[in-house]
Amino acid sequence: MRSTSSLTIKWVKPDITAEQWEFDRHPDKQEFYLRHNITWEQILSGIDAGRLVPYPRSERINGIPVALSYSSYDDYARYLAKAKRGYRRNYSLMEDALQRQGALTLPAPIILQCNGEALLFSGYRRLCLAWNYGMVPYVWLVPLG
């Protein structure tokens, strides 16, 4: 799937194994996993049931609230201000590449959906890059439970 403005991002299915840190160590996401009894094995086995769906800048996807999406620009600015230097630097490198090349192919951010709730599992920088350039990004929406 493609999102376009004057620049272009092509979204592809992400490699879930590259995102295990988000499950094992991200402190803000642990409560969601515990509340829904989500295991890493469930995520691994459910990833292929996911699909690319558009995600306009919003706190909801398909009417379902998305935890940790920080979808407003003000939320993004606050998040980035608190982020470590390496986090901001990686965003800047991605932004520079988009401006220089005019097009990027990126793994889609991952959203886990479970029991009427959703969680932005990974890919916030990629999501923000698209949103900040007026694009509608695509995410890999994974139904669990």
Give residue spans per PLM region.
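Short alpha-helix boundary/capping and kink motifs at helix termini
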Residues: 2, 6, 46, 50, ...
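A short, basic-hydrophobic beta/loop patch
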Residues: 15-20, 24, 104-145
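Short, flexible coil/linker segments at or flanking structured domains
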Residues: 31, 40, 98-100, 125-127
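N-terminal extension/subdomain marker
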Residues: 1-48
